[in-house]
Curated annotation (Swiss-Prot):
Catalytic reactions of this protein: (4R,5S)-dethiobiotin + (sulfur carrier)-SH + 2 reduced [2Fe-2S]-[ferredoxin] + 2 S-adenosyl-L-methionine = (sulfur carrier)-H + biotin + 2 5'-deoxyadenosine + 2 L-methionine + 2 oxidized [2Fe-2S]-[ferredoxin]
One GO MF term attached to the UniProt entry: 2 iron, 2 sulfur cluster binding
Entry similarity comment: Belongs to the radical SAM superfamily. Biotin synthase family.
Entry's cofactor comment: Binds 1 [4Fe-4S] cluster. The cluster is coordinated with 3 cysteines and an exchangeable S-adenosyl-L-methionine.
Entry function: Catalyzes the conversion of dethiobiotin (DTB) to biotin by the insertion of a sulfur atom into dethiobiotin via a radical-based mechanism.
Organism of provenance: Cenarchaeum symbiosum (strain A)
Pathway involvement of the protein, from the record: Cofactor biosynthesis; biotin biosynthesis; biotin from 7,8-diaminononanoate: step 2/2
Gene designation per UniProt: bioB
Designated name of the protein: Biotin synthase
Entry binding sites for [4Fe-4S] cluster: 61, 65, 68
Amino acid sequence: MGIAECRDKVLGGGELTKDEARGLMEADVTELAAAADEITRRFNGDGVDVEQLNNIKRDGCSEDCTFCGQSAFYDADKEPHPLPEPEEVVRAALKAKKEEASSYCLVAAWREPTPEGFEKVCTIIQEINTHVGISVECSLGFLTRERAARLKGLGVKRYNHNLETARSKFPEICSTHTYEDRLDTLEIAREAGLELCTGGIIGMGESRGQRIELAMELARIRPEEATVNILVPVQGTPMELQAPLPPGEAERFFALVRFLLPRSVVKISGGREKALDDDGRAILRGGANGIITSGYLTMGGNDSSADMEMIREAGLEA
């Protein structure tokens, strides 16, 4: 089945098979992106979900994810940053709202929150709700059912917990927890009524087949948001010498994710400024309808004004 037939199947409410997904990844990337854009417009309109992050607990993570510069395994001398005071986070959230962000995500580099850390995060969320009025999302590691219910009760809209890569690739990426651990937290979040944000990182040496495998897993989960990062190798990690993806491969993957998740937010996340010549402008017309702006967890990014201008120049709306 070709691009047009797959597009029409999706527009008609159908779901693609793995063989059809495999065929799309072999198709002409320009035609594929154009068809993905048609699907995006049909189901999602011209709006772009603009998100800002706050890395409220940085470095010293106990997990050994080979791509991550925040892991204690690869820089044991790096001291973990303490959680900021709520007032500091409120100021940053107010700035994000002024810069037209539609959501604000609190991110913490740990396996799971300590009891004291979780309570402080809850206080931060309450203060943002009181003083800012922006949609709050969280990425805090593994969840218990009790904590998921608490976050839902505080008005948290969406919970991020990435799969990172395909199940078949995951043992090469991390040994301190399993793929099933990640799936379990997504299930706990969903059971609590939280929307799901999940995705991964492409360009970590996985095969094209493994990228398809990841995309099919995302299609099975059906998150409200799928977030796709492109690896930026971090010095001192096992991935520091990883070669970049071939040209067009990121564009293919974003388009495929749109075919598989026609109604979800598909977000261009970390790595776009370094891995893509146009900062992701073409992908906003090739399947994506969301971006993270104003920097990421450990590296900078475009400021919000540049990204808002990019969105407008693409004929879209923040």
